[in-house]
Amino acid sequence: MQQIPSIKKAKELGLYTITCDYLPENPGHKIADEYYNVSTTDKEAVLQLAQKLQIDGIVAYASDPAAPTAAYVAEKMGLPGNPYESVKILTEKDLFRDFLHKHGLNCPYAHGYTTYEEAYRDMENFHFPVMVKPVDSSGSKGVVKIYDKSELKAAVKEAISYSRSGRFIVEEFIQK
């Protein structure tokens, strides 16, 4: 629904619009010139499609998970866009927290992990409560607040269930 104004504006400007997504019922597909059933998180499949169609521009509207794919395709095809590595940093919570820390910017203590065991061994470095989050999800999906490490295993399972990469972060909870 949120993509509709952008698609309409592109068409007003005389641009040929092509949408792709794994959800064929998304309303933007109905007004685009073409639609392809390709997941916006599958960057290689979107790149292959973009090369086949010889596109000359790519954007991702109202979709955090699609932003890295759009940047990747633009970079690979020499199209205008944001640098892929920059977009990855902005959309993957562990990379973003590391970036903030490395550059001396305020942020809660956080660390990224791939396994429960790895995180469990590191819990002595955290002050509870903490938040457990998938690194690459949005809309608070898979986010769990825990009060001690006995709750970690269930929280990690929940976070990973929403992570495309299988990675998660643990970050200290900041009370306002």
What kind of region is each of these model predictions?
Residues 1-86, 117:
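ATP-binding N-terminal substructure of ATP-dependent carboxylate-amine bond-forming enzymes
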Residues 24, 136-138, 174-176:
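Glycine-rich beta-alpha junction loops
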Residues 40, 90, 113, 146-149:
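Conserved aromatic
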Residues 45, 118-122, 151:
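Short acidic active-site motifs
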Residues 58-61, 110-113, 173:
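Structural motif
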Residues 75-142:
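A conserved helix-loop-beta module that forms one wall/lid of the active-site cleft
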Residues 106-109, 125, 129-132, 144-176:
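Conserved ATP-binding module of the ATP-grasp superfamily
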